């Protein structure tokens, strides 16, 4: 396994200083993707402000197959919004004042997307120290500090592999959302589409440290080549920050995706510690890994790794939530019965008053039962116990026990005539858990945002954002002042009690 350390190209990097703290730093909030918020959310009383996240959304009939990057939040309540500006490429970040949405600054990027089906998310990150990184062309990271200051700046520029990077602007692509560790080191996947530096090979993982020094390792398997690091799979870090987790595609084709692997790497050296095939627990065949999804590893408080895959053969289109020990050497429990395009959120068991099991934490997942995929169309959300099990009614498999489930509320006109009781899909790829109110905030394709009260197992608040649309799944987050942020139909909505 090759590993490279290079002196990276840096523009104005040494002069940058980190002076702001971070409330929401990236995909699913933190490097473990827990999606837990310590900030109490405001009531879902009104849409306080809204802003487009796509200036040229490309619809497929009545559907929108575009993933949007998560907003980021500073402690000073600056909301940093990734925005798609063109039909197929073109990206910028806009910083807005959380109180009223007023524009503070705009930073553009020359980034272009890797080859894709559904449009991938554009994933920036804030370090815990408040430094902002976002992807640029040729594998470049663009950098700025003082993110709460109402001024556009000339960003710093960091390249992880070579000084003459502009030669490879068109071919070297950052292919995952960025992830920051507790010290401010940045991790991401890359791929090379065309001529590029030989050392990079065709796909791998890169790290840029706080001094701008780059490390990268091409990913390979002894049993065969790796096709690419999985698009949209934000790298995750163990609780002690020493192990990095990411998934990658093998070359065996399955439907619209491929077989895949989950890697554990030393976070400092990027040495591969272990790599395991991702298998369908029912058939024993390679599970499908799809670049149209955004599933990323979630790290439990005990170090377990949870990762969602699609089923093979495709019996349900729900997939599975696989679980692994921290070193990936074993599976400490049964899978969850849903894994497609979902990053599980961590729920402290104390938030669920009706729970009397032994687990210290539970998992919140989307739990759709797709009518178009052989299910009954009764789409739900679920709280699951990773240490207990029950028989899955559809597959006969033993799966994580359902602690709570809740059915969506809006009938689905596409399916309700053939599937009585069918409701619109839940439209989340990561849902924020509000620790202060014992609730989960989740989007639905009916265009509404729901507060799921875990004490009463009911929807205690609902607010309509749009008329509803079929779309690629989106995140929910909570800002520094408690406003809830949700994306629906290419628009970011800030919801709260009012200004």
Residue ranges and their predicted role:
Residues 1-2, 483:
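Intrinsically disordered, low-complexity serine/proline/glycine/threonine-rich regulatory regions
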Residues 4-15:
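Bacterial N-terminal signal peptides
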Residues 18-20:
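Boundary at the C-terminal end of the N-terminal hydrophobic targeting segment
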Residues 23-27, 31-65, 75-81, 86-119, ...:
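Extracytoplasmic/lumenal domain signature
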């Amino acid at each position: 396994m090759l590993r490279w350390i290079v002196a990276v190209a840096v523009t104005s990097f040494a002069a940058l200083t980190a002076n702001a703290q971070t409330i929401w730093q990236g995909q699913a909030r933190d490097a473990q993707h827990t999606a837990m918020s310590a900030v109490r959310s405001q009531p879902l009383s009104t849409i306080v402000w809204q802003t487009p996240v796509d200036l040229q959304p490309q619809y497929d009939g009545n559907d929108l197959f575009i993933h949007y990057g998560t907003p980021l939040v500073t402690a000073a309540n600056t909301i940093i919004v990734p925005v798609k500006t063109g039909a197929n490429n073109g990206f910028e970040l806009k910083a807005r004042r959380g109180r009223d949405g007023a524009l503070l600054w705009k930073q553009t990027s020359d980034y272009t997307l890797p080859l894709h089906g559904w449009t991938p998310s554009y994933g920036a990150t804030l370090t815990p120290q408040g430094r902002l990184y976002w992807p640029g062309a040729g594998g470049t990271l663009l950098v700025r500090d003082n993110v709460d200051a109402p001024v556009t700046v000339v960003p710093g520029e960091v390249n992880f592999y070579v000084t003459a990077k502009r030669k490879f602007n068109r071919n070297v692509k950052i292919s995952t959302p960025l992830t920051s560790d507790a010290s401010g080191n940045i991790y991401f996947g890359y791929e090379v589409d065309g001529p590029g530096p030989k050392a990079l090979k065709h796909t791998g993982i890169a790290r840029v440290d706080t001094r701008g020094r780059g490390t990268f390792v091409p990913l390979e398997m002894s049993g065969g080549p790796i096709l690419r690091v999985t698009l949209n799979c934000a790298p995750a870090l163990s609780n002690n920050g020493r192990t990095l987790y990411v998934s990658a595609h093998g070359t065996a084709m399955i439907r619209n995706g491929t077989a895949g692997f989950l890697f554990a790497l030393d976070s400092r050296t990027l040495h591969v510690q272990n790599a395991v095939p991702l298998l369908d627990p029912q058939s024993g065949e390679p599970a499908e890994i799809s670049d149209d999804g955004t599933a990323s590893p979630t790290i439990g408080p005990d170090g377990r790794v949870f990762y969602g895959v699609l089923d093979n053969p495709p019996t349900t289109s729900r997939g599975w939530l696989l679980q692994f020990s921290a070193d990936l050497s074993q599976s400490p429990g049964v899978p969850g019965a849903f894994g497609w395009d979902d990053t599980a959120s961590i729920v402290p068991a104390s938030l669920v008053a009706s729970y009397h099991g032994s687990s210290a934490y539970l998992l919140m997942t989307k739990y759709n039962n797709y009518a178009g995929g052989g299910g009954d169309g009764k789409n739900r959300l679920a709280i699951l116990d990773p240490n207990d099990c029950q028989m899955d009614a559809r597959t006969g498999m033993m799966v994580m026990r359902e602690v709570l489930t809740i059915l969506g509320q809006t009938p689905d006109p596409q399916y309700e005539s053939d599937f009585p009781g069918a409701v619109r899909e839940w439209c989340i790829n990561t849902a924020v858990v509000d620790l202060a109110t014992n609730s989960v905030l989740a989007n639905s394709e009916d265009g509404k945002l729901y507060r799921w009260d875990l004490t009463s197992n009911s929807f205690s608040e609902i607010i309509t954002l749009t008329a509803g649309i079929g779309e690629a799944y989106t995140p929910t987050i909570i800002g520094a002042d408690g406003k809830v942020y949700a994306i629906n139909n290419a628009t970011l909505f800030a919801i709260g009690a009012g200004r």
